[in-house]
Amino acid sequence: MGYPKEGETIQIHSYKHNGLLHRIWNETTILKSTELCIIGANDRTMVTESDGRTWVTREPAICYFHARQWFNVIGMLRDDGVHYYCNISSPFAYDGEAIKYIDYDLDVKVFPDMTYNILDEDEYDDHRKSMNYPKEIDSILKEYLNTLLHWIHQRKGPFAPEFVDMWYERYLRYTK
């Protein structure tokens, strides 16, 4: 159903493998939109959890989604540099309402010096069993975790120097 237009404000919805809604980011401004890649930005946007609790993001963030990668990347601009939060997830879909993806629990937190921690491995194992992830999905997710780590080491895509700053400058044009 097409792609969001640059400058448009949309929501981001994450789901779990069982189809249940996990989290909604209320407002993200689209900065780039093609069939392969969507880049968006938000700042102090409301996030709604599956249980109805809400919270507001603390800093500007650049969100990177790719149609052929089983991960998405959020670059957060903080005083000490860019921090990244990476979700191992399905490739994105856009249905005219929101960017949507399945969150597969494994996350990678990347610090400004490009060191990283892999998070939520226990949660992944629990959900893999309780939601019966097929072996094919398990293999794909592990493969793309390695691809993501390679991108981090190579400073590729959203990890490239100046990537987040460049897109943040573009985002500021929409907020004036």
From Swiss-Prot:
Mg(2+) 1 binds at N87, D103, D107. InterPro entries: DUF402 (IPR007295), FomD-like_sf (IPR035930), Ntdp-like (IPR050212), SA1684 (IPR016882). Has nucleoside phosphatase activity towards nucleoside triphosphates and nucleoside diphosphates. The active site is at R23. It holds the Pfam family DUF402. It comes from Bacillus velezensis (strain DSM 23117 / BGSC 10A6 / LMG 26770 / FZB42). This is Nucleoside triphosphate/diphosphate phosphatase. Belongs to the Ntdp family.
